[in-house]
Amino acid sequence: MFSRKDIIVLGMMIFALFLGAGNIIFPPMEGFSSGQHWTSASLGFVLTGVLMPFITLVVVAILGRGEELTKDLPKWAGTGFLVILYLTIGSTFAMPRITNVAYEMAWLPLGLTENNANVRFVFSLIFNLIAMGFMISPNTIISSVGKFMTPALLVLLIAVAITVFISPLSEIQAPSNAYENSHSLLIGLTSGYQTMDVLAAIAFGGIVARALSAKNVTKTKDIVKYTISAGFVSVILLAGLYFSLFYLGATSAAVAEGATNGGQIFSRYVNVLFGSAGTWIMAGIIVLASLTTLVGVTSASADYFSKFSVRFSYPFWAALFTAMTITVSQYGLTDLLRITIPALLLIYPVAIVLVLLQFLRKKLPSIKFTYNSTLLVTVCFSLCDSLNNVKMLPESINSLLKHFPLSSEGMAWLVPTLVMLVASIFIGKALHKTHS
């Protein structure tokens, strides 16, 4: 039986898994830029940064695992997409980046050691071995993350949020030109889209499904019920946090001068509010947020790759990905970001469309035709966005791409994909009549 306490613990686990260090340091800059429009901007951010991943999580939990989203694609295409997804959000790019964030934003400000390659390696080794200790047995993840790490993280974040609303550092300033000239809700939507949490939801859905299965929750109706209930807990927590961080950014004029990212704004704000203790509070928040995401993503990646061969089990892949993360994290953040972004621009739209098609699947007259044709269009346009990001897109194609709606927001794929989806449904009906 899944009790109310179990729902709360699962909800807190989902919250902690999504709440990576990047999710904490990104909203303050958006809040600072949106200024007096911070409420509508944060609403847009929450819609795409919280609601969309939540919907994806429910869909994947019902299916049982993320790979079920690709079952109607050719096997090579589905496997290729998932391998790229898990490597991108996992030990090849995102997890080394999280390790670097923990090192540079949590450890170094404490001033306990010098900043050099040896210290970075030792920190990466210890940090990832601690994470591996939590993930080596997947059945302990809900317990370790939901019962221990999340409450500690919440205490620190709530302390910051309450203090920010009680004692804001500055009056809310006028919005930047981008927010002044455009509808702040739409900019917030785009900003939330850039969190890439839909990709993480595909990975985390399997963790939620296993957590429910461990409590003998296997019926679809019950999976939906408890996933929505637990997910609602995480939605409330994440939305509350994001609104707080947007407000922090909107009232940060006194400390934001010269800041190039939200992490700097957050760090300065916390240090002013809490004095010398602020450095330790900041370190605690970043380390716990980084650790929970590291545990969740690496565990999900190991679980997926363990399906390929019985010779290489979950512990083997967990150890391998931990070693990869430690190795890759020795490179700088700039290099990691430069390589990661093009991969994300390619696969994120595909993930969104896969979730959309899953909702429509039972109503499609020709499932495989709609999947293949719609995703082909999505991949073509998202590939253009990816190549354009690294300045490898031919100018002739780039000039044509600019004529598509939302191309300036990096979403040129959206309208052509929807057009192809509708067209494929009509074509599928015609094909169905022809063969009947």
From Swiss-Prot:
Q: What would be an example GO MF term here?
A: L-valine transmembrane transporter activity
Record keywords: Amino-acid transport, Cell inner membrane, Cell membrane, Membrane, Transmembrane, Transmembrane helix, Transport
Membrane topology classification? Multi-pass membrane protein
InterPro entries (UniProt xref): Brnchd-chn_aa_trnsp_Livcs (IPR004685)
Q: Give one GO biological process term.
A: valine transport
Q: Where are the transmembrane segments?
A: 7-27, 43-63, 76-96, 122-142, 148-168, 185-205, 228-248, 277-297, 314-334, 339-359, 411-431
Subcellular localization, per the record? Cell inner membrane
* One cellular-component annotation, GO: plasma membrane
PANTHER family linked to this entry: BRANCHED-CHAIN AMINO ACID PERMEASE BRNQ (PTHR30588:SF0), BRANCHED-CHAIN AMINO ACID TRANSPORT SYSTEM 2 CARRIER PROTEIN (PTHR30588)
| Similarity comment | Belongs to the branched chain amino acid transporter family.
Task: State the function annotated in the UniProt record.
Answer: Branched chain amino acid transport system, which transports leucine, valine and isoleucine.
Q: What is this protein called?
A: Branched-chain amino acid permease BrnQ
Q: Which gene encodes it?
A: brnQ
